Each structure stands twice: as C-alpha cells, then as structure tokens.
Amino acid sequence: MLNYLIRRVLYGVLILIGVNFFTFFLFFNVNTPDDMARLNIGGKRVTQEQIEKWKAERGYDRPLYWNAKAEGTEKVTRTVLWERSVSLFALDFGRSDSARAVDIGHEIKTRMWISLQLALPLFILQVIASTAFALLLVFFRHSKIDFWGVVLCVLMLSISALFYIIVGQFFFSRTLHLVPISGYAGGFDAIKFLLMPIGLSLLARLGTEARLYRAMFLEETGKDYVRTARAKGLPESIVLFRHVLKNALIPIITSAGSYLPYVFLGSLVFESFFGIPGLGAFVIEAIAGQDFAIVRSMVFIGAVLYIASYIAIDFAYTWADPRVRLA
C-alpha cells in the first residue's frame, strides 16, 4: 500500500508539472505582459515607461520561456515560467498582479473558510438526499412513484442552474422576503445568507445524482445475492439498505469523491451570483482582471485537490469492498 501511495504521489507531481506548463502556455497565448500592465495600470494613456515599470515590479520583464541573452542554465532559470513555477511548487503563491498586490496565500486561507461554509453542508446533504431519493425510487420501482420520480429527475437535470438562481432570488427574497437576495456576513449571521445558495445548488444537482444512483441500485437488484436474500424471506427494505446500498458504495464513492475539490474551491456560479466572497468569486475576479498570479495559484491548488481526492477514493474502495487490492 505504501508503494502504491508513493507511486501515485510521483504520478501526481508529473501531472502538476504538466498542468502548470499548460496553464502558463494558455494564459500567455491569449495575453501578454504588456496587456496585463495596461489593464492593471488603467487610464486612457499608458506610457511604455509605466508598462516597463509595472513589468519590472512583478517580474514580467524577463522572457517567458527561453532567455537567449543569458548563459548556461540561466537560459531556462531566468525566465518567467521557471521563476513562477519554482515558487508555486514551494507553495509560495506570492502577491497578485493587480494594483492592490494582495497576499494570495492569505486570501486563499480566508476565502477557503467561506467556501467551506457553503460547499461542505451542500456536499453532505447532496450525498444523503441523492442516495435516499434513489433508494426510494428503487423501493417503489415499476410504480407511479418511480415513474414520476424519474420524470422529476430528468426535469431537474434539464434546467440550468441559472434558472434556479433567478427563480429562487425572485421568489424567496423579493416576494417572500425570507432570506437576503445576496451578500455575506460572518458568524451565525452567515446562515441566512447561505441557506438559499445551498438549497438551490442541492436542487440543481439532485436530479443528476439521484438518477445515476437509481441506475446503479437497479443494476445491483438484479444480481444473484439479492435474489438469494429475497428467497430467504428478507424484507425489501433490509435487502436495499443492508445489501444493495453496501455493494453500490464504490460508484457512490467515485461520484461523491470527484466533487470533493469543489468543497474547497467553491462554486464559481453560486458565489458570484450571491455575492459570497469565497474562492469561486476570487477566481472570477482574477480572470476578469487578467491576474495570472491568482489564476495559476488556483489552478495549481485545484490540481492538487483532484489528485489527493482520487488517491483518497482509491483507499476508500478498499474500505467499501475488501476484495479490492491496491497494487
């Protein structure tokens, strides 16, 4: 198991190197340091001197990939790609490229807690609600409850998340005045600002997850061990909850585990629409401001979380099914 973990971590490092280079290439294929300087300096008339000063202050005055004027290894090391990559792998995110030059590491720590307040309850409720709803439909399979439940799932997954947001804000905030339409507050006051985003996000994902889990549970109900359990006279509820659910844990773990990075990174759409200052909103602001320092930091953290979550999923498989071995 230790050898497996070491091997996966080494693979993960290679993936991070590839992600870092690909992010760098894509960003500077669309933008140039001069474009970034003009956007951040602002104003109608930006002189070349101001641009060069901005680039020198933020380390963009060097070649991006290859320094032809340098000698030896400095042809590679005295480039923007190398200097930014080394600091990134040392978990030194530096400061943003904007005029405020905020400490990216501090912003991530502060905003991650806010994103967790939104995403962690949503993650837990999503797994419970989707599993329970899917089991309910399987329990009443081939009945009207199952039919209309599937119709409801298809309807929910066919509707855009933006529709839920617009209708929810109009109905619950403007009409009923139950919760604030947007914003955020610290402490227990955060609950009233997070209730609607959590509820609407749950609805937006429930149809997709419940329909997937229902298909997995139905596949399990046709297997020999289920027929044997029924032949022994076990009630259908025990067959479903004790046997079917246990043996369907692996696909559930896969589906739920793939969502784990979003728990930490936040939801881009919901945080932006509801004015929640989490990591999702942080990324949107960085993209709009062409802030490469923030963009590459968030992409790097996202890649680390995805690698870590899939390693955790593999270990969770061995817990859910003792027959699984990590080689």
What are these language model-derived features?
Residues G12, K44-R45, V127, V154, ...:
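Residue-level recognition of pore/gate-forming positions within transmembrane alpha-helices
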